[in-house]
Amino acid sequence: MPTWADLSSSALLPHFKLLWGFHHNPAANEYTGLIAGGHVSEWLGANFWGARLQDIHPPHVVTEARRFFDHILTAPAAGRCSGRLFTMGGKPVTGERIALPLAPDGTHPGGILGATDYAYVPVSGAVELIHENVEWFAI
């Protein structure tokens, strides 16, 4: 399984605006923001880097995100969502999201690299994640 160090910054750079990532601390059972591309930065600003999942989203969203992330790490599997990805200011935003496990030691999953592509909606307001039309791909 790839590690963060295996990722080529030159290969990822053209897609950086789509990327996001979390580190998982199994002892604390916490996910911490690690990579925030342009799209995530637009919603959350500097609040993503180093922030715990529960500090970024409301409790009901955290529960669903944890379920999604936990499956990625424990299966391990790649996850794909399509259709409604989130709401912004109550308006649905559609697109596609993928999330892949990463292993700090090359063997045991402990991080997630994701990419989200969507049609930009010029609205503002609270952002709430949606995991719709989820597909799993065993790794």
At which residue positions do the language-model features occur?
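Intrinsically disordered, low-complexity terminal regulatory regions
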Residues: 1-47, 51-55, 63-139
